[in-house]
Regions:
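Soluble non-transmembrane domains of integral membrane proteins
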Residues: 142-372
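Membrane-proximal extracellular juxtamembrane segment immediately upstream
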Residues: 62-89, 93, 339-400, 405
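Generic, ordered loop/turn and secondary-structure boundary motif
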Residues: 34-37, 42, 59, 74, ...
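A short, highly charged, low-complexity intrinsically disordered segment
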Residues: 10-14, 401-406
Length: 407
């Protein structure tokens, strides 16, 4: 018995300390956060981040910048898809997971080890700026909205369109002064699904769906029985591999049946590559159905009054291109002209409109529309980090000078 007691007493430090009356809450919190504050965890996360940046940069050559961001940086895990199936196996942490762990690690390090003194105020401000930068990036990746407005001279629009996503829109045209739009994202159009619409009694039945399709003449089909969807007398859609190229866009296509109280209203084959509205009626009310790029409606309208494309003398190299637009917002009593050109965007409300491109022999402009609720956070975070460095090194410099003077 004595030998056993001595053995137990020889290693008391390895056992967790029970909270006694004299144990402070701060000490308990520090003990709880200590494993999360590990420097090894920081190094592992940074090494993993370097790996996904390296692999994602290489892979974006094949799948494009946008898809690489979704797979590697705007995801919780990287997945491996088993050949011949849709079963996905996570094999590596993604950007969201690494960012969250680094954020928790940084906060835990402060709670477990940091003791606030004026001499360390610079470090506190510096790390607070880093935390704000991580939070700002997370908010941006979740809530950022990117779209485009394509305008011909004299044309007016009150919406922008997504360059990546499409929607199936059912438009109620029964009211003379407005339209009610029911939109279904293309990602929800899965074969065999029946989607309930936010209008009483309406359902959308998906009979067939292609993630991407090529539109060809019916005479180009390998055989009459080759799987296809007929869009019209001179066009059919055949399924092809989804594209990830930067200069190409997928053309999702679907065959759908609209149901009203369980009864078929009509069946159509629709494609975003053939965005022609199909008109029909429910009772006496006129409707349209169309497959088109996803739209973001705005409280204002914008009109292209003039587009200019300046070139360097004797060449076709673009020197500058600009759009003179008129912005009208009745809700804000706004009616003014604005000039948008390279590196000179238009800021309005929570949107930024950039000059992005042109077409149609310099008669059409393409404006990039960005909505980012956290666009100021990176500036604030970088300012805090710079201030923290200045304060911290300033204190060390003052202390060094004082020691030199005394010596």
């Amino acid at each position: 018995m004595t030998g056993k007691q001595e053995a137990l007493q020889a290693t008391p430090s390895s056992a967790p300390v029970a909270a006694g009356p004299g144990t402070s809450v701060t000490a308990l919190l520090k003990a709880a956060f200590k494993p999360l504050a590990s420097l090894r965890l920081t190094i592992v996360c940074l090494a993993c981040a370097m790996f996904i940046v390296f692999v994602g940069t290489l892979d974006q050559v094949q799948i494009g910048v946008y898809e690489a961001q979704l797979r590697y940086f705007k995801s919780f895990f990287l997945y491996f898809t088993l050949p011949g199936s849709n079963f996905r196996i996570p094999y590596f942490p993604g950007g969201y997971t690494l960012g969250a762990v680094l954020l928790v690690n940084l906060i835990a390090a402060h709670l477990a080890r940091f003791k606030f003194t004026w001499k360390k105020s610079g470090i506190l401000i510096l790390h607070s700026g880093l935390i704000l930068l991580l939070i700002g990036q997370l908010v941006t990746s979740i809530f950022e909205e990117e779209s485009q407005i394509q305008l011909d001279e004299g044309q007016t629009k009150n919406y922008s369109e997504s360059p990546y996503f499409d929607e199936l829109a059912i438009i109620d045209q029964s009211k003379p002064d407005s339209e009610e739009v029911i939109s279904v994202p293309a990602s929800r159009l899965i074969k065999g699904q029946t989607i309930s619409l936010p209008v009483k009694g309406l359902q959308l039945q998906v009979d067939e769906s292609y993630e991407n399709a090529a539109l060809i003449n019916p005479n180009q089909l390998p055989s009459p029985n080759y799987p296809h969807l007929r869009l019209g007398p001179m066009a059919v859609a055949v399924a092809i591999q989804k594209t990830y190229k930067q200069n190409e866009r997928n053309q999702p296509t679907a065959a759908v049946t609209l149901l009203k109280d369980g009864q078929a209203v009509g069946s159509w084959a629709l494609s975003s590559g053939f965005p022609q509205p199909v008109q029909f009626r429910i009772g006496s009310d006129p409707f349209e159905i169309i497959f088109r790029p996803k739209r973001y409606y705005r409280p204002f309208s914008i009109t292209l009054e003039e587009f200019k494309h300046d070139r360097y003398a004797g060449t076709d190299i673009a020197k500058n291109f600009s759009s003179k637009v008129r912005l009208v917002d009745p809700s804000a009593h706004e009616n003014r002209e604005a000039l948008i050109y390279m590196n000179h965007p238009l800021w309005y409300s929570d949107l930024i409109l950039y000059q992005a491109g042109f077409g149609n022999n310099d008669k059409t402009t393409v404006l990039q529309v960005m909505k980012n609720p956290s666009r100021l956070l990176p500036y604030i975070a970088c300012g805090m980090m710079a201030l923290g460095l200045v304060i911290q090194f300033g204190m060390h410099l003052v202390s060094f000078v004082r020691r030199r003077v005394i010596a």
